[in-house]
């Protein structure tokens, strides 16, 4: 039986090659916690965006040499994911103010470039916090809706 709180930590080079490894690990963590398919897919997109931002921006002044830390904290009703780097920081509020709001009727060819990753992360996750001290740390939380099946008309939680 799974304990009420598990903690998994990864340290990977700041390279796009490792995004798929992180996504695969996330899928396993979320599946083990009983998350729905939609929650897993949302979290995979959000984490991919955060890691890709770290790969593209954090270490560009350091010849793209650096480490990205990823933490998964599995709690009773949610999974908290923290992604951090020690690279160059950015002004979150300034970046956020430039990305939206978007008009649903706006032609996609004319959307502003950049910042969509932050927009996606905030749209897909339940809680998002960005810290900028020595590098950038993005903390995101997804509340888990347990996968359920029907058994003779009754909903049964899969555990």
From Swiss-Prot:
Group of enzyme by EC: transferase
Record EC number: 2.7.11.1
UniProt xrefs under InterPro entries: Anti-sigma-factor_SerPK, HATPase_C_sf, RsbW
Superkingdom: Bacteria
Catalyzed reaction equations: L-seryl-[protein] + ATP = O-phospho-L-seryl-[protein] + ADP + H(+); L-threonyl-[protein] + ATP = O-phospho-L-threonyl-[protein] + ADP + H(+)
Entries under SUPFAM superfamilies matching the protein: ATPase domain of HSP90 chaperone/DNA topoisomerase II/histidine kinase
One MF annotation (Gene Ontology) recorded for this entry: sigma factor antagonist activity
Keywords attached to this entry: ATP-binding, Kinase, Nucleotide-binding, Serine/threonine-protein kinase, Transferase
Pfam families: HATPase_c_2 (PF13581)
Function: Negative regulator of sigma-B activity. Phosphorylates and inactivates its specific antagonist protein, RsbV. Upon phosphorylation of RsbV, RsbW is released and binds to sigma-B, thereby blocking its ability to form an RNA polymerase holoenzyme (E-sigma-B).
Similarity annotation: Belongs to the anti-sigma-factor family.
Annotated protein name in UniProt: Serine-protein kinase RsbW
